[in-house]
UniProtKB/Swiss-Prot annotation:
It comes from Burkholderia ambifaria (strain ATCC BAA-244 / DSM 16087 / CCUG 44356 / LMG 19182 / AMMD) (Burkholderia cepacia (strain AMMD)). It comes from the Bacteria. It catalyses: glycerol + ATP = sn-glycerol 3-phosphate + ADP + H(+). Its EC number is 2.7.1.30. One of its GO terms (cellular component) is cytosol. ATP binds at residues 13-15, 266, 309, 313, 410. This is Glycerol kinase. Key enzyme in the regulation of glycerol uptake and metabolism. Catalyzes the phosphorylation of glycerol to yield sn-glycerol 3-phosphate. PANTHER family: GLYCEROL KINASE (PTHR10196:SF69), SUGAR KINASE (PTHR10196). Belongs to the FGGY kinase family.
Amino acid sequence: MQDQYILALDQGTTSSRAMLFDRQGNIVSIAQKEFEQIYPQPGWVEHDPQEIWSTQAGVAAEAVTRTGLNGTSIAAIGITNQRETTIVWDRETGQPVYNAIVWQDRRTADFCDSLKKQGLEAKVRAKTGLPIDSYFSATKIRWILDNVPGARDKARQGKLAFGTVDSWLVWNFTKHELHVTDVTNASRTMLFNIHTREWDSELLELLDIPRSMLPDVKASSEIYGHTKTTVFASKIPLAGIAGDQHAALFGQMCTTSGMVKNTYGTGCFLMMNTGDKPIESKNNLVTTIAWQIGDDVQYALEGSIFIAGAVVQWLRDGVGIIKTAAEIEALAASVPHTDGVYLVPAFAGLGAPHWNARARGSVFGVTRGTTSAHLARAALDAIAYQSLDVLAAMEADSGISIGELRVDGGASANDLLMQFQADLLGVDAVRPQITETTALGAAYLAGLAIGYWKNLDEVRSQWQLDRRFAPSMPKEQVEQRMAGWQRAVRAAKAWADDTQ
């Protein structure tokens, strides 16, 4: 097995990617292809499931062949994916009955409101760890059954299959033989009991979704089956599955209770490992399964921030004060602080821990002396402040004081932002050498299942530090800044409340 590699497939919201990793956890090859975003109506977001499959299969082959290798060089495949996105297909033909309804899609928001009005939120949260929201898969499945002609009849006859993106890829890689998912993806459907780790019959009945549609739920690291497609001539074990944020938590080696990672992308996704027991959040966080390896199940708390890197894109495309996103660090660093300016980037409402859909983006503290540099710095600071709000909620829910924050994602390359994040938290922000932690996590899960890596300790030893950012700002200064931020958030919420 000396010359073999692990292939990680990273099926994201805007592109399908594939990466080859060697035994040291280094990236050997990478391929990526974007695909179409479909917006049939305002608030609706869809993907073509066949395009998800064709782009993912295409980059898988490309990542392997561009290094002069073939399928025999692949020891196993690990899959990580955009979560919650919902695909329903015909078991006989393998054809989708409707486009994939993407996690961002809000078409079922009114139906979710009606469930809340029936007083069901506490029950759903107790079973699934999730609030009732159109973000999750359950109401998307129901929408397809209610709105695609003949779908409900076919579903009752056992002729339809539902899957999140991982299930759809495995179904196609095995030529319609395997209909499986893992516990992490199942835990994002709003149909899965995270305590019993089974599909919940009461929730299925409530939403009128036949049990026969659902995939078998497996661990995140086991051999599910082997590839049977023409993508690879040889049969390759499919051996790891995890939703993208769960895979990133594993790739960051946040393997013990209290360890936290923050992925800085378009939004921010913070996840804390809470060990072998789920913690019900009292602070508007989501409780979820982190992963399962063998009989060992780890749980996590998660908080999502809607706008992080997107605020930098707005400064570039909407306001025009920078030409490229990379310019923001130098512009922001040209002033020592924001001079009292606060930017609350609630362009799409506020996510965790506020969950205020009506709040809107606001800038406070502007004076005649305010410059584009102050705005740029306020934008970066806002990413760190929002992350702090979620981390404070995590500490309150878990009773665990955070020792350090492991960071990844595009904006983690911004040293100014990382330093300010450490200053606010009062603990180190730690950046690894390999920031492709989502794909790496999927690779590790697959490799562990087949013995490519012996155990968790061997994998842990591969995590390498790029840079550690230690807090250096005086405590009273931090408290003053945080008080200003909290005031700005209160003002943004008040603005929203006054529009009633």
